[in-house]
Amino acid sequence: SIIDYIERKLGLKVNMTKTKVCKPNELKYLGFGFYKHSKYEVIPHEESKKKFKRKLKGLTKRSESISLDKRFEKLNWLIRGWVNYFRISKMKTFLKSIDEWLRTRIRVIIWKMWKLPKTRALNLMKCGINKDEATRAAYSRKGYYALARTFQLGSSISKRRLSKPNKTKERRGLVFALDYYLA
């Protein structure tokens, strides 16, 4: 058999727990999976995607009280590392959905940091939202996540604002996975 040939002729040890014969789309190898379009192509395996999302979720817990700068630094480190490792694979759609989800979570964190309705209204007005809309959002009874997906927060805490460094250049902006992947 093949195992005898590998062990006797080549002098290699075969690990039976790791060795298997299967179709490429059933295989996970170093975090990568494979799928067949017209030919087999490389993608991040589903388990790798779930692990990445779980790590992002851990860094964007709203109960964790760390500064936004430190949070962005950790997120940038994680996103760059993951995208660099899986760069050879096709993952544009996955990264687009991750970026949308991450922006919503960041908006929730910022909304919670502003705490008081008065502060929220003032900060929304600073971001260019008119007074009526800002007041309506600030005094809303909706939950954090529902408010993070509204027009007021989506346009005031936009992708452009999140990725832009602050005025003192102490904080670099947030790196978005899809932009980094396509660059």
Regions picked out by a protein language model, each given a short descriptive name:
Residues 1-183:
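Non-catalytic terminal/accessory segments
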